[in-house]
Regions:
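Beta-loop-alpha module in the N-terminal Rossmann-like domain of NAD(P)-dependent dehydrogenases
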Residues: 63-71
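C-terminal substrate-binding/catalytic core of Rossmann-like NAD(P)-dependent dehydrogenases/reductases
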Residues: 49-50, 96-151, 162
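Short strand-turn motif at the edge of the Rossmann-like AdoMet-binding core
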Residues: 64, 87-90, 113-115
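C-terminal capping/lid region of NAD(P)-dependent oxidoreductase domains
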Residues: 20, 54, 84, 91, ...
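Helix-to-beta-strand junctions that scaffold the AdoMet/dcAdoMet cofactor pocket
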Residues: 77-79
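A glycine-rich helix->loop->beta "capping" turn
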Residues: 51-59
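N-terminal Rossmann-like NAD(P) cofactor-binding module of classical short-chain dehydrogenase/reductase
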Residues: 58-61, 84
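Mid-domain Rossmann-like dinucleotide-binding core that forms the NAD(H)/NADP(H) cofactor-binding site
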Residues: 1-42, 46, 59
Length: 186
């Protein structure tokens, strides 16, 4: 229930909880869950997909430590979603097809052990390409990203062959070369 509250405070939407116990499901709703489901329901994964518009959940916090629960989570997590293994899954009571359930959909499994927690919620490569471009252009606009010092020379596109040859063969190739298309003579 603490994980549920942290997720709520972090802005998880929709915030789904699954539990076999109806009293715990009721408590989860009081603590901020948008939907509390019974994982034993035959259509459980379908209920999750419906609640998420067919996408699946972006992040799962698996707190039971039961391998069957992890296997079930792999069926409703979104493509490129994350599953945090807060519960300690020690008994391999459910076979998991890592190729189909983890590799192909790009799911990230995170061992959430007290001793290996990240200090900050930032991981290399977590941003999208769009985020990278937007941030880079913002940094340029406010002068925090300097690109002019990275340009070694400006040349006519007619010298492209020479430029690429130098980039391939030079012991210390130029840092950056810009083609000035105004110099191009057709």
């Amino acid at each position: 229930m603490i994980a549920l509250q942290i997720a709520a405070l972090s802005g998880a939407v929709p915030l789904l909880v699954s539990d076999y116990d109806p009293a715990r499901r009721a408590l989860a709703l009081k603590l901020g869950a948008d939907l509390a489901l019974n994982p034993a329901d035959a259509d459980f994964a379908e209920q999750v997909r419906e609640a998420t518009g067919g996408r699946g959940v972006n992040a799962v916090v698996e707190v039971t430590g039961v391998a069957a629960a992890l296997k079930q989570a792999l069926k409703y997590v979104a493509r490129e979603g994350r599953i945090s293994l807060l519960g300690c899954t020690r008994v391999p009571d459910a076979a998991i097809d890592f190729y189909q359930d983890v590799h192909c959909p790009g799911v990230t499994l995170i061992g959430a052990n007290t001793w290996n927690r990240p200090r900050f919620e930032s991981r290399p490569g977590q941003w999208t390409e769009h985020d990278d471009y937007r941030t880079f252009l913002q940094l340029l606009a406010v002068g925090k990203m300097q690109v002019r010092p990275l340009i070694s020379e400006i040349v006519s596109p007619e010298k492209a062959r020479d430029v690429y040859e130098r980039l391939i063969t030079a012991k210390n190739p130029p840092l950056g070369i810009v083609f000035d298309w105004k110099q191009y003579s057709d």
